[in-house]
């Protein structure tokens, strides 16, 4: 889809479909009023008949209005004045896209810039709008014998006042990069596990480096992981025929002496639970257990597209967790790269076992910040549901920055504590630490486990178990989160 920004009067624009907003109580914004005047009150007449109440997301298509170059006018309800928030604005945008998809026109122009969205300026409104539209165009039908019909719509133009055009352009540019990153994340998450395994992800990284020249990729194999002393990482992979990989991504958009930000992604390409086997019902969704790593891919794609002036490192800890005669057993003790020993009480608490070695590996980059992203605990879904990611960290300023980024990007997180009392749940009589802390506060104790390997830098942990994918039903699939949050965090660091 091509997105453009133009500063023209809506009544003079030649387009297949002109989109205008109408509030409840027949409220017309400046753009709708201009078109209404040009058509001799055609819009007002329709509203007086009660064909459109103006509730958020209601649509009404008008054909061939007089004195317009637009072939059609699509009216969309914007709700009550001064009550339009992010959620309602996204609903409005989705309703517009749903209608446009069913039309024959190859282009459309959206005159929505005069809508007041609470707490959002022209830049933020444009970004929210374009991101919603672009993400709404996503289709995954790679393995369908009957593909989706090609979309007739090829171009969307945002109409903006001249004073706002630069801000709208920038918002649109950022949104397209974020949406492209989300699409990559969703594609990788939605792939079947017989295709998407650790070696495949290494090849995908190399492919991304070919697309963007500023990206360097190194793929560490099983031999190298053993040389590094990553006993915890290797323990997760030892039951599978698929070899593990630590994928290292490096982008240098700033001066070489500027410390990088590091993103660490959990990449369990399929999680059976290992010897601590999961129930069969819903196990197919454990292909999404690599969505942390997929979100690092997606965030890198967005950063590379925007060419942000920052230095960024990605560490993707990729393995498959399978039961076999050679698999790790409950009760096994392994030595991590840090030298700390871990008693593995449950092989289904494997994400933290690959992440801990990756977090130790991150030390060599002398980072400004390290953020790990993982579909780590079912307890996070119990605590926060599927709307909000869990967030913990050892530096309050970093945590606040991520919370702020999530609010702006409409990809929110919520902070959970890492009090010392929770650390005691991880005590082991046989090793330095146990990999689970009992039934209470499971998300927090998982964060406590990771914190033991992140003491040499500012670190935060995002638990995306509830937000990375949608379970069951027709909408089942990866969401692309938290690419918007992470990209916004890096945009702010690049200023």
Curated annotation (Swiss-Prot):
Active-site residues (renumbered): 278, 352
Organism whose genome encodes this protein: Pseudomonas aeruginosa (strain ATCC 15692 / DSM 22644 / CIP 104116 / JCM 14847 / LMG 12228 / 1C / PRS 101 / PAO1)
Single GO MF descriptor: manganese ion binding
First-level EC class: hydrolase
Disulfide bond sites: none
UniProt-listed SUPFAM superfamilies: Macro domain-like, Zn-dependent exopeptidases
GO cellular component: cytoplasm
Gene3D superfamilies xrefs: Leucine Aminopeptidase, subunit E, domain 1, Zn peptidases
Catalytic activity: Release of an N-terminal amino acid, Xaa-|-Yaa-, in which Xaa is preferably Leu, but may be other amino acids including Pro although not Arg or Lys, and Yaa may be Pro. Amino acid amides and methyl esters are also readily hydrolyzed, but rates on arylamides are exceedingly low; Release of an N-terminal amino acid, preferentially leucine, but not glutamic or aspartic acids
Free-text function comment from the UniProt entry: Presumably involved in the processing and regular turnover of intracellular proteins. Catalyzes the removal of unsubstituted N-terminal amino acids from various peptides.
Cofactor(s) essential for the protein: Mn(2+)
Lineage of source species: Bacteria, Pseudomonadati, Pseudomonadota, Gammaproteobacteria, Pseudomonadales
InterPro entries: Leucine_aapep/pepB, Macro_dom-like, Peptidase_M17_C, Peptidase_M17_leu_NH2_pept, Peptidase_M17_N
Keywords assigned: Aminopeptidase, Cytoplasm, Hydrolase, Manganese, Metal-binding, Protease
Pfam families, alphabetized: Peptidase_M17 (PF00883), Peptidase_M17_N (PF02789)
Family the entry assigns: Belongs to the peptidase M17 family.
Cofactor details (free text): Binds 2 manganese ions per subunit.
Gene name as annotated: pepA
Keyword Hydrolase: yes
Subcellular location: Cytoplasm
Gene Ontology BP annotations: proteolysis; RNA metabolic process
Binding site for Mn(2+) 2: 266, 271, 289, 350
Protein's UniProt name: Cytosol aminopeptidase
Superkingdom: Bacteria
Residue sites binding Mn(2+) 1 per the record: 271, 348, 350
């Amino acid at each position: 889809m091509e997105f453009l920004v133009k500063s023209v009067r809506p009544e003079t624009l030649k387009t297949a479909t002109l989109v205008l907003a109408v509030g409840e109580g027949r409220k017309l914004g400046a753009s709708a009023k201009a078109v209404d005047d040009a058509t001799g009150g055609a819009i007002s007449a329709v509203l007086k008949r009660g064909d459109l109440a103006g509730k958020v997301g209601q649509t009404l298509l008008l054909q061939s209005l007089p004195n317009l170059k637009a072939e059609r006018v699509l009216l969309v309800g914007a709700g009550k004045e001064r009550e339009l928030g992010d959620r309602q604005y996204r609903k409005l945008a989705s309703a517009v896209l749903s209608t446009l998809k069913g039309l024959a026109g190859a282009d459309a122009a959206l005159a929505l810039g005069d809508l007041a969205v609470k707490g959002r300026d022209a830049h933020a409104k444009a970004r929210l709008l374009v991101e919603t539209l672009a993400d709404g165009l996503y289709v995954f039908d790679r393995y369908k014998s009957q593909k989706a019909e090609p979309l007739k719509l090829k171009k969307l133009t945002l109409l903006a006042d001249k004073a706002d055009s630069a801000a709208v352009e920038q918002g649109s540019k950022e949104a397209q990069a974020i949406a492209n990153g989300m699409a990559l994340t969703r594609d990788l998450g939605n792939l079947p596990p017989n295709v998407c395994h650790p070696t495949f992800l290494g090849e995908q990284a190399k492919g991304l480096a070919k697309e963007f020249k500023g990206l360097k990729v190194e793929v560490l194999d099983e031999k190298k992981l053993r040389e590094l002393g990553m006993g915890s990482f290797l323990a997760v992979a030892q039951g599978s025929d698929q070899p593990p990989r630590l994928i290292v991504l490096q982008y240098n958009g700033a001066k070489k002496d500027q410390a990088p930000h590091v993103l660490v992604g959990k990449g369990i390409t399929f999680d059976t639970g290992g010897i601590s086997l999961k129930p069969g019902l819903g196990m197919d969704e454990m292909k999404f257990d690599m969505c942390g790593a997929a979100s690092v891919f997606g965030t890198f794609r967005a950063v590379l597209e925007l060419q942000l002036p920052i230095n960024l490192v990605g560490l993707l800890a990729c393995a498959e967790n399978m039961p076999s005669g050679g698999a790790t057993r409950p009760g096994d003790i392994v030595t991590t790269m840090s030298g700390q020993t871990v008693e593995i009480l449950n092989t289904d608490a494997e994400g933290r076992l690959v992440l801990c070695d990756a977090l130790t590996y991150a030390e060599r980059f002398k980072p400004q910040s390290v953020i790990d992203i993982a579909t780590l605990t079912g307890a996070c879904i119990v605590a926060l549901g599927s709307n909000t990611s869990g967030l913990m960290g050892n530096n309050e300023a970093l945590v606040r920055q991520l919370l702020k980024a999530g609010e702006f990007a409409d990809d929110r997180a919520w902070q959970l504590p890492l009090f010392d009392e929770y650390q005691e749940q991880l005590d082991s009589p046989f090793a330095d630490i146990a990999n689970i802390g009992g039934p209470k506060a499971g998300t927090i104790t998982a964060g406590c486990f990771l914190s033991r390997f992140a003491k040499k830098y500012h670190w935060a942990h995002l638990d995306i178990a509830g937000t990375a994918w949608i379970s069951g039903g027709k909408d089942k699939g990866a969401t692309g989160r938290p690419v918007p949050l992470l990209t916004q965090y890096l945009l702010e660091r690049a200023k």
